């Protein structure tokens, strides 16, 4: 697809990104930077939603590796995403951008329960919608949650914000000769075992015809550049014959 034609976009952001240069928690300077990037994106007349991770506070899979039951560990990870979502909502609101948090785990005194119809209504009215608590179920990644929410809100595009400017055949940080892909098909991602998103997330997007863009959130202006159709991301979609 022509990415520049996308009008409803879901942005998946890892919790680790919120740490900035810190070893833990939320870096105020990165939060301010993220707000600026989001505001620049919605200035393009984009309807924007986010799915945010919680790895800067707690990773369920790490807790499980340390002997904690996986279900309980994943539930703790879901709660970490709620903290991040509320922090981002507050930062956006303080900067004059309306934002709503919707959670997969009901906590009515903290956030709205997830509802795809109300989420789409909020977005049409110019509000940023932040989805937290993953899918609400253990054993599912936030990548899968992002793909699921993208399907539910009928997004035109799913953007995954990462540390690098696209998808490579190996880690470009460790391998300076790593090859960057401009475009890929869902099938190529799966068969090449490229560590972009988990298989469930890729399959959901493929079955529902939602292109995926992978870009660097740490490059200022990259988000808006991608939304304008500039080659700042690797685009994953089915190729037209």
Curated annotation (Swiss-Prot):
ATP binds at residues 12-15, 55, 59, 162, 168, 171. It is an enzyme of class 2 (transferase). Inhibited by UTP. UMP binds at residues 54, 74, 135-142. One of its GO terms (biological process) is 'de novo' CTP biosynthetic process. Keywords: ATP-binding, Cytoplasm, Kinase, Nucleotide-binding, Pyrimidine biosynthesis, Transferase. Pathway: Pyrimidine metabolism; CTP biosynthesis via de novo pathway; UDP from UMP (UMPK route): step 1/1. Transmembrane segments: none annotated. GO terms for molecular function: ATP binding; UMP kinase activity. It catalyses: UMP + ATP = UDP + ADP. Its EC number is 2.7.4.22. Pfam families: AA_kinase. It is found in: Cytoplasm. Homohexamer. Catalyzes the reversible phosphorylation of UMP to UDP. Belongs to the UMP kinase family. This is Uridylate kinase. It comes from Magnetococcus marinus (strain ATCC BAA-1437 / JCM 17883 / MC-1). The gene is pyrH.
């Amino acid at each position: 697809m022509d990415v520049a034609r996308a009008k409803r976009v879901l942005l998946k952001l890892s919790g680790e990104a919120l740490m900035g240069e810190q070893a833990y928690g939320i870096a105020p300077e990165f939060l301010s930077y993220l707000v600026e990037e989001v505001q620049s994106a919605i200035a393009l007349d984009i309807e924007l939603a986010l799915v945010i991770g919680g790895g800067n506070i707690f990773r369920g899979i790490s807790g499980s590796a340390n002997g904690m039951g996986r279900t309980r560990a994943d539930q703790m990870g879901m709660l970490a995403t709620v903290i991040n979502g509320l922090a981002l909502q507050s930062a956006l609101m303080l900067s004059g951008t309306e934002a709503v948090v919707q959670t997969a785990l009901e906590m009515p005194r903290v956030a709205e329960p997830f509802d795809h119809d109300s989420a789409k209504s909020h977005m049409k009215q110019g509000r940023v919608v932040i989805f937290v608590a993953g899918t609400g179920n253990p054993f599912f990644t936030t990548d899968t949650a992002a793909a699921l929410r993208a399907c539910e809100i009928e997004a035109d595009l799913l953007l995954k914000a990462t540390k690098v400017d696209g998808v490579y055949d190996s880690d470009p940080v460790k391998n300076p000769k790593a090859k960057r892909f401009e475009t890929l098909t869902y099938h190529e991602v799966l068969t090449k075992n490229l560590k972009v998103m988990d298989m469930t997330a890729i399959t959901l997007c493929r079955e529902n015809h939602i292109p995926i863009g992978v870009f660097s959130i740490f490059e200022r202006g990259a988000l808006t550049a991608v939304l304008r159709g500039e080659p700042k991301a690797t685009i994953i979609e089915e190729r037209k014959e």
